[in-house]
Amino acid sequence: MLIHPQFDPVAIHLGPLAIRWYGLMYLAGFIMFLWFGRLRIRQPHVAARGWTTRDLDDMLFFGVLGVILGGRLGYVLFYKPSYYLSHPMEIFKVWEGGMAFHGGFLGVVVAMWLFGRLRRRHWMEVTDFIAPMIPCGLAAGRIGNFINGELWGRATDLPWGMIFPQAGDNIPRHPSQLYQFAGEGVALFVILWLFARKPRPMGAVSGVFLIGYGAFRFAAEFAREPDNFLGLLALKLSMGQWLSLPMILAGIAMVIWAYRRQPGAGAPQPAA
């Protein structure tokens, strides 16, 4: 049995300014996105499509806005709509926590669609480009969750079960944040990076991301404690699982569509 180390959520104190670990993890995710993005631009089939470091920097700006706005609105709408309906001003207090990946994902899709319109690229060409780097941010975010001692798992008697004092019950639990780090972060990154090393039909890389994330998240939710204000929903599945199922189905549909359409695996596509 292990005990959560109880990290101080504030990593650095600079006078009245407190820099939190969770914010540093977001920063680490953005840095890894840029670093691996520059490596991706050097791949011959990617360079042939005219991607530049300026595109990458601009995509990060659009993506950050999509993550923050979509993640916050997703949390409000998917998890606590009644609370925020009664306390609308609380929606703007992003620094107090409360982000949802599925909302952030939708926000990024919209942001990449807008970016594609500005660059005259099809939105799926844009999402195909960024998909292999997204797990970097997911991995960093899950480490942030672990440092904060939040989003802990369900009770377990396994040797690596961990007591999270914030849970308030002194029961060993799955360190589900680390499971998600390993699945949604490390494993998904490896799968996507290897898959995207060769030219693929437009939409295929994005589809594999949807399938991979949805599957890893769906599996991890069996070890993660359901949100106490929601519990388990129909068929004893969590909200995270119900939101992941459409992602898996959409990903399968995109991969099938991409390979049936076969526009020429590496050919640039017109803007939509």
Swiss-Prot record:
Which Pfam families does the UniProt record give?
LGT
Q: Where in the cell is it found?
A: Cell inner membrane
Q: Which GO terms describe its biological process?
A: lipoprotein biosynthetic process
Q: Tell me where it mainly resides.
A: membrane
Keyword Kinase listed? The answer is: no
Q: Where are the transmembrane segments?
A: 17-37, 59-79, 95-115, 129-149, 176-196, 202-222, 237-257
The residues the record assigns to binding a 1,2-diacyl-sn-glycero-3-phospho-(1'-sn-glycerol) are R142
Q: Which GO terms describe its molecular function?
A: phosphatidylglycerol-prolipoprotein diacylglyceryl transferase activity
Described by its record, this protein's role is as follows: Catalyzes the transfer of the diacylglyceryl group from phosphatidylglycerol to the sulfhydryl group of the N-terminal cysteine of a prolipoprotein, the first step in the formation of mature lipoproteins.
User: Can you name this protein?
Assistant: Phosphatidylglycerol--prolipoprotein diacylglyceryl transferase
